[in-house]
Amino acid sequence: MSYKLEKEAFVSNLTGSSSIETCGLLLIGIACNVLWVNMTARNILPKGNLGFLVEFFIFCLIPLFVIYVSSKVGVFTLCIASFLPSFVLHVISPINWDVLRRKPGCCLTKKNENTFDRRIAGVTFYRSQMMLVTVTCILAVDFTLFPRRYAKVETWGTSLMDLGVGSFMFSSGTVAGRKNDIKKPNAFKNVLWNSFILLILGFARMFLTKSINYQEHVSEYGMHWNFFFTLGFMALGVFFFRRSLKKVSYFNLATFITLLHHCLLVLTPFQKWALSAPRTNILAQNREGIASLPGYIAIYFYGMYTGSVVLADRPLMYTRAESWKRFQRLLFPLCILLVLYLVSNFLSVGVSRRLANTPYVANVAFINMFFLTIYILIDAYLFPSSVPYGSRVPKLLEDANNNGLLVFLIANVLTGVVNLSFDTLHSSNAKGLTIMTMYLFIICYMAHWLAQHGIRFRL
């Protein structure tokens, strides 16, 4: 077997893990968040380059290490261990908020109320940590140090990486939910331009991978399709539904698309075609990408709904009461998503990222909506409302959040470079961890460099 086929086989025919274990892994991100807050509250976090390295250790290396050792130690044991440093700090050291309150711009006055930073730290934590988990996994999966149960499943089941794909869509929708630019005269032109850029990226990736004979997992999206094509066509689909059904809420719209897609899969030969049709024409060659598109559009709308609840009508001071009010508004949608998932299981409809079917959409939307609210509540309950946004968010995470698409692009390019330069399949765990550390450091440094130079790329 050639090395290319060996690498393709390494990520094929996998069955995944459980949603419970995946949530356990995501709790590690919460633990890292709490640790950073505890260090910040006690003014023991270094400044400058050393501070950047400490944040890199907390938010990149701890999750990487947890993923690696989780094949030997239970995930929930690791969760408990991850919260221990914060507990120790809480016991032995007092909190000092005065240093953070004294930072310039932290006090709300009539003079600065129009420019007071209304960004919500919990949203930044959620979006940036989801992005860092995603970019960690896309390279780590090519090393043997990455447990196979966290890699993308072949057809039925779920895993950490399966969640990561949907989470990218949900996270993108979250920040789009606060906007209401559908009525603007140039709205369609903007959507076309954004889609064009994403499709160009998709074609560039396709031609590059074909020209260098790069390994491909065909059953993931198809022979030519890739994630950038999904993003490009999704933007057009979202615009079409928003323009056609203006008065329907984002949540109802997402549920309608999910159920319509489910009926199409179950009541017609569409599911059979998507999973087993001979690849005799351009559509059949890319059947997975086409079949999963409605599901990803639905996930995006669920993200938009969540963003419209969390980010709309923000007060000048985001208090505990405001956070709790947002959480209460999301309780009913969370219950609906949970029911959708449980009913799907009861009817023996398997979770499938390959199809982006109802249980997959419900699972992704529920987990993301739930963890986003947890991040927001943690921020509100651990920080006094008088502490400014700039003191509530690590610079590393803010930089990653501000340039999410560029960070994702850089990660894709670096993943290709590493795979072409190293025999990842036969690398020792020590070598794999070293390469992963350098890879993550370059990504974080590039995000920091882009922020320092005011470069921000948004679609």
Curated annotation (Swiss-Prot):
Major localization listed first in the record, in broad terms: endoplasmic reticulum
Transmembrane feature ranges: 20-40, 50-70, 73-93, 120-140, 156-176, 188-208, 221-241, 250-270, 290-310, 331-351, 364-384, 405-425, 432-452
Pfam families: GWT1
Sites where a glycan is attached: N13
Location(s) in or outside the cell: Endoplasmic reticulum membrane
Domain of life: Eukaryota
Record's GO cellular component terms: endoplasmic reticulum membrane
Membrane topology term: Multi-pass membrane protein
Swiss-Prot/TrEMBL keywords: Acyltransferase, Endoplasmic reticulum, Glycoprotein, GPI-anchor biosynthesis, Meiosis, Membrane, Transferase, Transmembrane, Transmembrane helix
Pathway(s) the chain acts in: Glycolipid biosynthesis; glycosylphosphatidylinositol-anchor biosynthesis
EC number: 2.3.-.-
One of the GO BP terms on file: GPI anchor biosynthetic process
Keyword Endoplasmic reticulum: yes
An annotated Gene Ontology molecular function: glucosaminyl-phosphatidylinositol O-acyltransferase activity
Function in brief: Probable acetyltransferase, which acetylates the inositol ring of phosphatidylinositol during biosynthesis of GPI-anchor. Has a role in meiosis.
Family: Belongs to the PIGW family.
Protein name as catalogued: GPI-anchored wall transfer protein 1
Organism: Schizosaccharomyces pombe (strain 972 / ATCC 24843) (Fission yeast)
